[in-house]
């Protein structure tokens, strides 16, 4: 399904609004105005002038790029990314803090999805172009012009190519690969069972590959599937995620994270033998916030610390 850029889409600037949500194992706390970047009302990460209140870092450290290693701790930084049509956000999957990275610059606008490889190299698509994007600044560099999908992820090395990770996506139910150097698109396979991407795809090294879909025997709107990253076909359906138009999907430590067209953020976990989604409240969001995509590094932990997570076949 293609995103439609309508009058309800808000274009945000860097520091225009930042959400943070508190921790908790089963209960997701809400978002507060706090930006890891901090700053004055008129500076990067600043606030106040736009009516959303002042932003400060509360003494926190600026986050490195997604999936990178914190030098002082030697541990992975649990960052995943989401975006509206024009603005890049980041979510710390441990603290549940979300901050604005900034508006996309360099010519990319109406961005329809993002994908991040194991080294935190990130790519975004619009309907007419493929771009590389800097996760620290949201600056885009054009790679190629063509027709590109709104379901985008890298899959691990050895899946479609023995030597490199492959950038993949869905056009409806058609599974495709995109060359990150030339932008060339190649058909790989298809999703059967009457499902079509709604949607977004995310894949993890040593873990699963997941897709949000519509249709199928459940008349999904939306459901979460495990798919085979070699063929793009169905492995299993987990059922409804209780949200429609889940245009953004990311993953960290055994749980998925959904970002929908209505501006909602939620976690997706496996609880007592069934899929369970927990909304992450967004108090005082900007009017008409709409998420159009999300992504996480393929080197994200595939399971929780206790080994739990969404079960795979």
Predicted region positions:
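Ser/Thr-rich, Pro/Gly/Ala-heavy low-complexity intrinsically disordered linkers and tails
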Residues: 17-76, 303-313
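Structural motif
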Residues: 87-90, 129-134, 173-179, 218-225, ...
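A short beta-strand motif characteristic of beta-propeller blades
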Residues: 97-106, 139-144, 184-192, 233-240, ...
């Amino acid at each position: 399904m293609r995103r439609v850029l309508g009058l309800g889409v808000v274009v945000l600037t860097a520091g225009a609004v930042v959400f943070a949500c508190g921790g908790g194992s089963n209960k997701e706390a809400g978002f507060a105005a706090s930006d890891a970047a901090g700053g004055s009302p008129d500076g990067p990460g600043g606030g106040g002038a736009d009516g959303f209140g002042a932003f400060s870092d509360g003494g926190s450290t600026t986050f490195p790029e997604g999936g990178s290693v914190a030098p002082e701790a030697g541990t992975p930084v649990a960052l995943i990314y989401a975006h509206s049509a024009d603005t890049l956000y980041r979510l710390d999957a441990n603290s549940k803090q979300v901050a604005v990275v900034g508006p996309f610059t360099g010519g990319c606008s109406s961005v329809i999805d993002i994908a991040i490889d194991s080294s935190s190299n990130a790519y975004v698509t619009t309907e007419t172009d493929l771009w590389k994007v800097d996760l620290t600044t949201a600056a885009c560099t054009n790679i190629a012009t063509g027709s590109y999908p709104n379901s985008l992820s890298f899959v691990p090395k050895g899946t479609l190519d023995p030597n490199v990770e492959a950038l993949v996506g869905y056009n409806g139910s058609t599974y495709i690969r995109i060359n990150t150097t030339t932008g060339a698109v190649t058909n790989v396979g298809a999703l059967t069972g009457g499902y079509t991407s709604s949607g977004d795809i995310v894949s993890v090294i040593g873990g699963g590959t997941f897709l949000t879909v519509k249709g199928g025997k459940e008349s999904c709107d939306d459901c979460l599937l495990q798919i085979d990253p070699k063929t793009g076909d169905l492995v299993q359906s987990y059922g409804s995620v209780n949200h429609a138009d889940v245009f953004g999907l990311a993953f960290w430590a055994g749980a998925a994270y959904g970002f929908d067209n209505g501006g909602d953020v939620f976690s997706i976990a496996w609880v007592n033998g069934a899929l369970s989604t927990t909304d992450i409240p967004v108090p005082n969001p900007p009017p008409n916030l709409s998420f159009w995509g999300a992504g996480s590094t393929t080197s994200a932990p595939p399971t929780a610390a206790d080994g739990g997570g969404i079960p795979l076949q």
